[in-house]
Amino acid sequence: MGEAVGIVELFGLVAAFAAADAGCKAANVTLEDFDKNKPANADALPVPLIVAIKFRGSVSDVTAAVDAAVRRANEVSGVITSYIIPRPEADTEKMLKISGMDTSR
């Protein structure tokens, strides 16, 4: 078990970059990953790409980063959900390392 992980799932790559920037500027966190997904109903969505960004750091820093990222993403295109895992278990850590942008799988 290590540092906290915060995940923000949102609409669009531009919003993801804006949210990641805001989160990293708001707190002492590391931006771990961008996961992207084009859902089957993409044509019906306002923005046809869903992106999840992951922050890692202390619980208080991750909370501040996620809050800032959510505010910024809502200004751009919208947030689907966000969640903070204070101390991920070892098995959860394995799943957190899986990335939709990992082409080695």
Labelled PLM ranges:
Residues 1-50, 56-105:
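Long, contiguous binding/interaction regions
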